[in-house]
């Protein structure tokens, strides 16, 4: 445990920050680069613990990967060139690595056992395992394969036409990766569009894939081709500074080179709806992904309702938006967010418990919470639940509390944003 005590601030936030590379895209760049033929180069790779688990897994399967800071070079072996690992694969805390790799490993001609830390071992895997079994996959583990560790017995896979019962880009991506192995076309249908980095990047690598936002089809592709991936800044990391600059009076912050993929920008839509002074500058397309600079100037805010199709576009930002809601006038209602119960921790519980501890007026509901705003927050102990996004939320909360906030463990921040505290200190004026 590595606690951090944060005193109340007297100033405001001013300056420019370049947030680290997008976690979702960093994971996928390693996966697709490894199963492609030829060289893939990656710039602005997220140097966090989760993404390193993905690199380590492919190194164990014989893929030459060189990492120099945030630059990565992958000498892809192609799907047929991956080798059976000599030991079990440790995915640590990374749900993305686990779920995507289950789809990939299911169709490879060897057996693999995968495991993770205590937190990951509590996260349900049947949402991926069940449809993979419909494709012919053989996956065994605790409680009928619902929890790690899992053993995947490689086999030939059938195609599938599958309606996603959950709003999960990870499940969609796992099935699309499995579809690379199957002889016929695999189709994945979703009611609400989730993040589409897998579809966008597979197209760039030469896969036979089509998508209209709700329906994605993929056919067997003999060989993906290596390419260059420039990873944009992670909007989920930028969200903490967006909220901080909105809340702290007199603040003005610029966030450089942030990914603005429309399946991820729900946070921007919601804070604008609340009355934020936020503008996008220098907008451009890089490697098929929209990026730009975000300028935020503090302003009074009003509560809103966050629900429905907005949820998958901001699922990771709900904790920090809940904090913002405590400082907005009126009531904010969050619903349809039951997916947060199966993240690194039960984030609905973690958010409501911590905000209540700080003096916020929060009523938990089955699929979200009701937050009555314009609340003075006191200090106190803040439980990270060993969840990086909850820990960073606690640090940002200290900017608007009357007394000291003690976050019980900040080591988990290394999963997605190792330099978070230093970056925040750099704009405290």
UniProtKB/Swiss-Prot annotation:
This protein's GO CC annotations: cytoplasm
Positions that bind 3-phosphoshikimate: 23-24, 28, 168, 170, 316, 343
Protein localization: Cytoplasm
Chain positions recorded as phosphoenolpyruvate binding sites: 23, 95, 123, 170, 347, 389
Enzyme active site: 316 (proton acceptor)
The entry's keywords: Amino-acid biosynthesis, Aromatic amino acid biosynthesis, Cytoplasm, Transferase
Record carries keyword Cytoplasm: yes
Catalytic activity: 3-phosphoshikimate + phosphoenolpyruvate = 5-O-(1-carboxyvinyl)-3-phosphoshikimate + phosphate
InterPro entries cross-referenced by the UniProt entry: Enolpyruvate_Tfrase_dom, Enolpyruvate_Tfrase_sf, EPSP_synthase, EPSP_synthase_CS, RNA3'P_cycl/enolpyr_Trfase_a/b
Pathway named in the protein's UniProt entry: Metabolic intermediate biosynthesis; chorismate biosynthesis; chorismate from D-erythrose 4-phosphate and phosphoenolpyruvate: step 6/7
Record-stated family: Belongs to the EPSP synthase family.
Subunit structure: Monomer.
Task of the protein: Catalyzes the transfer of the enolpyruvyl moiety of phosphoenolpyruvate (PEP) to the 5-hydroxyl of shikimate-3-phosphate (S3P) to produce enolpyruvyl shikimate-3-phosphate and inorganic phosphate.
Protein name as annotated: 3-phosphoshikimate 1-carboxyvinyltransferase
Record lineage: Bacteria, Bacillati, Bacillota, Bacilli, Bacillales
Gene: aroA
